[in-house]
Amino acid sequence: MTRYTLRALATQWRAWSGTVAVLALAAGLINVCLVHRMTVTRPDVVAAARAAGVDPAELVVPGISVAFYTAMVTIPVVAVVGQSCVQALRTSWALWRLAGALPRQVLAAVLATVAVLGLVACVPGILLGQVAAQPFASVLTRLAAARMGWIEVAQTPTTLLLTVVIVVAVAVLGAVGPACAAVRTPAVEAVRDAAPGGRRRMGVGRRILAGVWAHACAGQLFVAFLAPPGRKIDGWPTGGGQAILASLLLAVLVVLLAPALIPRLLRLWSAPLARLGGPWLIARRSALWRSESSASAIGLLALAISFTAALTTSLATVQAVVEAARLNVAINQVDSLVLAAILGAMALLGAVAVVGMSSRSRQREFAVLRCAGSTVRGVCRQVVVEAALYVGTALLISLVPLVVTTAGESLFYARAGMPLVVRPGVGPVLLVALLSFLTLTAVLLAPIPGATRTPIGAVLAAE
């Protein structure tokens, strides 16, 4: 089975390319966080910090904060992309069953395939970490203590091993559910793709995790809106940022509940668009027909937009409060905005990878539409509307984290005796939504030229 697994990877590299890109970026982010952690805990760095009058713990805290936010985005993205890729190639696994492979062999082959992808992606990811580790450490050192000076970082066997283990483990765990489903795939799907529609049920493990996560969200919302501010240092209250954490927890909860929540939401709010007919009706049905992959893509889009909304709203609120209270406090927004851009781009890349995996079925769909009399221009309009449906649903979901962050941050500073200022980050949210729409439109339009050049009969022959 090892030979067949490697051959499948070689022949289906286009289908795996999006997954490899996401895993590589995740490996790079994880690697720089691990390198920073190992660096600031080295004995020579601890001694240098004490000699400079800096508490060594101050060097560790920024790295932990960044690593936490990175994990909040990276783990859901890697898990969702891994399981979506396995699900998109379920017909290939059914072919193996039809050829006589045992269920346990198919299960082992699927998980081995994902593990190999994780190993391959770690190579460019670690190279990316090698380049970004030093600037990353310099930024965090400046945030912790400007007087600390230059800290030289270096890769170690421990950081390399942990990077590989974390990336491969998360990818494989995310693929376990779809791999088990692939084992139970009827052999008839080997000769004809089953429609990807239908309501996807959440597994027991996912339900339990979602329930635990929902309780964590409720507790964090309680802290964000009711916990008193901490003592003031130089006129600035401590204990802030609880609303950001609540918003991120809610965004991850949406990813966990995506199979059950997002198709219903998409069906509900897009119902009036079906009355417009034409491309609107076809695009809506296409999105609902792919409810499984579209739910995963929309969940990751909502994660990207929600993270941007939470962080930019918090930064705008802090800056407005400082100006209104006339405080002499310097707020460094560049580093936070760079972090938001990187993690938001990763979630967007994950959504693009999930959408791109459906290119094979889209070519057949375009052929059916052309056979029914639709023109290439009509198909393009349908694709644009479908991308708008994805982004519109993600925007609706992101309104909740935006409102939570805006209200929570404003009320926190008001309870601390600061001016009540409301600064929702609407502009950055709309900008990210526009970039997401343009990117998804480009990805959805990509299969059209190939589909138009291929004869309709050749495309439909597989049906």
PLM-predicted stretches and their roles:
Residues 12-17, 76-115, 349-391:
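Interfacial "coupling" helices/loops that link adjacent transmembrane helices in transporter permeases
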Residues 2-36, 58, 71-74, 162-175, ...:
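Alpha-helical transmembrane segments, especially those used as permease/efflux helices
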Residues 30-42, 82, 115-145, 159-184, ...:
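Small-residue-rich transmembrane alpha-helices
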Residues 50-72, 144-176, 197-212, 240, ...:
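Conserved transmembrane alpha-helices of multi-pass membrane proteins
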Residues 16-20, 74, 110-128, 199-214, ...:
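Selective transmembrane-helix segments that form parts of the transport pathway or gating/packing helices
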